[in-house]
Amino acid sequence: MAVIVPPIKSQGIKTKLVPWINDVIFRSGIDLVNANWIEPFFGTGVVGINSPLGGRRIVGDSNPHVINFYNSIKSGIVTPQSMREYLQREGELLERAGDAGYEHYRLVKDRFNKEHSPFDFIFLSRAGFNGMMRFNRKGEWNIPFCKKPNRFAPAYITKICNQVKAVETVIRQFDWTFCNRSFIETIREARRGDMIYCDPPYYGRYVDYYNGWTEENERELFEALRDTEAHFVLSTWHHNEFRSNDMIDRYWDSSTSLHKNISIMVVVISKTDTL
């Protein structure tokens, strides 16, 4: 089955890992029909959107803009048609704007930082430099323009709208709850027989306003997963050519401290990835 790619673009998206994650779930012995999907670090949503489980989807994220976007699809505010109309209009303004498009990018960025529109969120996600998502200490979008004033060509708009349609279909198919809250609160929703998927921010790597991560956070996550009665899958990074993840040895290699319902996926960051 083809992986559904969500409209939100971000570095580190787990699209290529979805088949691997789902294979772990298939082999876990979990009740695929009735188990609920619990995801406290939803991010772009690519893993949860492609979950093979048939129960409820209860997901959270510390970034309110991610949650607002998905709730806007759920409520019908964001549709393939409304997104197309928005991107066609803003794309034309971007192409005609001064400073090779930067004037309009700045306008949308300033507007988003005040109004938090889910449409502007996708515009910035797609027109920002190198597919990055970063917020400053005030919680404002903090990524420069990709310097492509013709970014929203007709074929690219269609691609994004098709992604909105695919996500809309999955949201209508299942019972979804999207919440802007702490990872601990989301994990507490899990019950015996459910599946928790965790892809937390990476300790020791770049953080921003919404995805800071400390050793204390790592310890809290470890204890929450240790104590849950649900199954869970954890994906994290192991090392690159510059450093290794100290939290692996400190917490996650201690499998005897956990229980039989765990599947840990250690994702090796390649040497070409930046810190």
Where does each model-flagged region fall?
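Structured helix-beta-strand junction loops
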Residues: G54, S125, Q173-F174, D227-E229
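A residue-level signal for conserved active-site and pocket-lining positions in enzyme catalytic cores
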Residues: Y70, I122, F232
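Short His-Asn-centered micro-motif
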Residues: E39-F41, G60-D61, C179-R181, C198-P200, ...
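SAM-dependent nucleic-acid methyltransferase catalytic core
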Residues: A2-V24, I30-L32, I77-Y197, P201-Y206, ...
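Glycine/threonine-rich flexible loop motifs
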Residues: Y206-G212
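Long, positively charged, glycine-interspersed low-complexity recognition regions
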Residues: T214-L275
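Conserved S-adenosyl-L-methionine
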Residues: V18, L32-E92
